[in-house]
């Protein structure tokens, strides 16, 4: 299944806020309609919607998400928490969380077009897994910096999660540590996602 490129508001109206996909928020009325239908939802649909929420927020294909679930299942610790940490430490998500891109698709475009460096080297793979002490910067070119500046000016100035530091005047971000689950920027029940995939195998 390919990455979703359809109407974004349609997705947030059904699944709730997906800040990685779009800054738009569902109207309160649509939230109430979803809640009124929640009693009719099967357990399968509840798990499916949590999985879809994760997939659309991080902009993943079905195959990519399944691969992350399998990697998380082989790691020590809670599979759900490891899954979220893996997704949060992707380069495209780190750029989004730093405020250097307004959405994860926007961050992915910056990476694909070779505007981003990690530790002084161009990285053009959005799924690159960032590590503690990684330094993320833009290419020292006017166009690259103008793009980042535009994103930073238009992004809402939210409190930065403690696993990251931003030096906006230098167009530089620093990964301080692996993200703690309490700093995840998405309202999600990761256990339901793991359950969804465990029942598919």
Swiss-Prot record:
Name where it mostly resides.
plastid
Q: Name one GO molecular function term.
A: rRNA binding
Q: How does it assemble?
A: Part of the 30S ribosomal subunit. Contacts protein S5. The interaction surface between S4 and S5 is involved in control of translational fidelity.
| CDD domains associated with the record | S4
GO BP, one annotated term: ribosomal small subunit biogenesis
Superkingdom classification of source: Eukaryota
> Which gene carries the instructions for this protein?
rps4
UniProt keywords, alphabetically: Chloroplast, Plastid, Ribonucleoprotein, Ribosomal protein, RNA-binding, rRNA-binding
**Protein's cellular compartments:** Plastid, Chloroplast
Cite the S4 RNA-binding domain residue spans from the record. 89-150
Protein name, UniProt field: Small ribosomal subunit protein uS4c
Q: Write out the similarity annotation.
A: Belongs to the universal ribosomal protein uS4 family.
Q: Which function does this protein serve?
A: One of the primary rRNA binding proteins, it binds directly to 16S rRNA where it nucleates assembly of the body of the 30S subunit. With S5 and S12 plays an important role in translational accuracy.
| Residue ranges, annotated region (Disordered) | 15-43
Organism in which the protein naturally occurs:
Drimys granadensis
Task: Report if keyword Plastid is assigned.
Answer: yes
GO cellular-component terms in the record?
Answer: chloroplast; small ribosomal subunit
HAMAP family registered for this protein in UniProt: Ribosomal_uS4_B
